[in-house]
């Protein structure tokens, strides 16, 4: 993937820059891909279900409302994402099992970590408009993320 600064320099008028600092937890430090959106807080059932389906190298973006008291992604869900060909997972919230996540061949970015798991009541929505980090995202847009930050584009960017 081309570095984020290079994409910004070429496409500054066509992108949204994410203003939320995210940490990397998977083994891939930079990823890009078409977005698929999920909105769920305190319940990761929808995210787990989506990641159990074929991902076609997409990136699941989870708006967990920024909650820090429960983890949206752990090792088992992340392993399912790898098995089902997801390029990455972005979480406006927390993850857990970080020692296992760092060895998985996938990009995983989140606000932080917490050991507690979520409720399992099938609450949440998929394939909807979400907004965090000063950007608006819908399924079908593209996300680019590396150690420099992250950005959203309406379409795949080429350099």
Report the location of each language-model feature.
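Feature captures the catalytic cores and cofactor-binding loops of soluble hydro-lyases/lyases
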Residues: 1-139, 156-159
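Short, charged beta-turn/beta-strand-edge "cap" motif at the junction between a beta-strand
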Residues: 136, 149-151
């Amino acid at each position: 993937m081309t570095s984020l600064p290079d994409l910004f320099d070429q496409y500054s008028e066509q992108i949204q820059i994410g203003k939320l600092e995210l940490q990397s937890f998977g083994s891939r430090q930079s990823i890009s891909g078409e977005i698929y959106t999920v909105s769920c807080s305190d319940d990761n059932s929808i995210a787990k279900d989506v990641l159990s389906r074929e991902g076609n190298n997409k990136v699941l973006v989870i708006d967990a409302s920024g909650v820090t008291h429960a983890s949206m992604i752990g090792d088992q869900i992340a392993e399912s994402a790898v098995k089902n060909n997801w390029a990455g997972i972005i979480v406006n919230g927390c993850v857990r099992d970080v020692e296992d996540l760092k060895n998985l061949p996938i990009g995983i970015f989140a606000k932080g970590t917490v050991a507690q798991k979520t409720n399992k009541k099938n609450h949440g929505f998929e394939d909807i408009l979400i907004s965090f980090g000063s950007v608006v995202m819908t399924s079908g847009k593209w996300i680019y993320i590396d150690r420099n930050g992250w950005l959203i584009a309406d379409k795949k960017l080429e350099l």
